[in-house]
Amino acid sequence: MANLLYVTCNVKPQNKSRTLTLGYEFLEEYLRRNPQDEVQILDLYRDNIQRVDLDVLNVWWRIESGEDYNFVSDGERNKIARLFRLAEQFRRCDKYVFVTCSLNLWFPAEFKMYIDAIGIPAPTNRMTPLAAKSMLPGQSRKSLHVHACSPHNFVQEQELGVAYLRSVLSFLGVTDHEAVLLEGDDPERVSGGEHEKARHRLLELAHRF
């Protein structure tokens, strides 16, 4: 049995978003073929993602300087706990699906907050004298990224958000990557052929993901 984490970052309702619509079709087909797998769904706009703020940094600095964790305030402790829950959730899974859309040639801020959360030290990586090192077990992990670019900036965005997420996931130990890029997220402003081509590829990926 595999554990799949399905992460969306799109403020639109599903019927107004190509990425959410196609992503859900992928998920339905995946579950039809893999009913025994466990799926966890995370909506970065709906679910309150803890950002790495000054309270969080203060806790890290104090722990690094040798201070007792018991002196951390309840508010600081709650923030750290929320970050660790997200990182542990990521660590426990072995398949990841990210459904995102473009905002100013990159991701919405909520997605970067999530990447910061899963990248905190201890659950997913640790610092060594030479560099940071992934702490995920050696088993095969794979990811699928469904991303809607702005139609007039399609080429440039392939080099920004998609490459960034691939680099982060590779560092964390995810070695198998797939990406399906859409030219725009608006269902009413797309050619039927381009949409069906993306849909066909996602359904094909669901058979072997």
Language-model region placement:
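Helix-loop-strand module that forms the ligand-binding subsite of alpha/beta enzymes
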Residues: 75-163
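Hydrophobic/aromatic-lined pockets within catalytic cores
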Residues: 27, 31, 119, 123, ...
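N-terminal beta1-alpha1-beta2 submodule of the flavodoxin-like/Rossmannoid cofactor-binding fold
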Residues: 1-100, 105-113, 200-209
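Cofactor-binding loop segments of dinucleotide-utilizing enzymes, especially the Rossmann-like FAD-
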Residues: 9, 148, 182
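Residues at the starts of beta-strands that form the adenosine-phosphate
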Residues: 3, 38, 141-142, 176
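Glycine-rich phosphate/pyrophosphate-binding loop and the adjoining helix
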Residues: 28, 155-209
